[in-house]
């Protein structure tokens, strides 16, 4: 694989993984809030 391809793809992969990480963290937070609300009711 050409090094130029890596230079082009690296920022895209980093941004994609960062977005997935943030979405996953937000989803876990929402699930935890939902479970906590379920216990309080």
UniProtKB/Swiss-Prot annotation:
The keyword Transmembrane helix applies. InterPro entries: PSII_PsbY. This is Photosystem II reaction center protein Y. Pfam families: PsbY. The chain crosses the membrane at residues 5-23. It is a single-pass membrane protein. It comes from the Bacteria. GO terms for molecular function: manganese ion binding. Belongs to the PsbY family. GO terms for biological process: photosynthesis. Its main location: membrane. It is found in: Cellular thylakoid membrane. PSII is composed of 1 copy each of membrane proteins PsbA, PsbB, PsbC, PsbD, PsbE, PsbF, PsbH, PsbI, PsbJ, PsbK, PsbL, PsbM, PsbT, PsbX, PsbY, PsbZ, Psb30/Ycf12, peripheral proteins PsbO, CyanoQ (PsbQ), PsbU, PsbV and a large number of cofactors. It forms dimeric complexes. Loosely associated component of the core of photosystem II (PSII), it is not always seen in crystals. PSII is a light-driven water plastoquinone oxidoreductase, using light energy to abstract electrons from H(2)O, generating a proton gradient subsequently used for ATP formation. GO terms for cellular component: photosystem II; plasma membrane-derived thylakoid membrane. Keywords: Membrane, Photosynthesis, Photosystem II, Thylakoid, Transmembrane, Transmembrane helix.
């Amino acid at each position: 694989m050409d090094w130029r391809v890596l230079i082009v793809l690296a920022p895209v992969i980093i941004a994609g993984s960062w977005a997935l990480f943030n979405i996953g963290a937000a989803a876990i937070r929402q699930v935890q809030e939902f479970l906590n609300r379920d216990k309080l009711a």
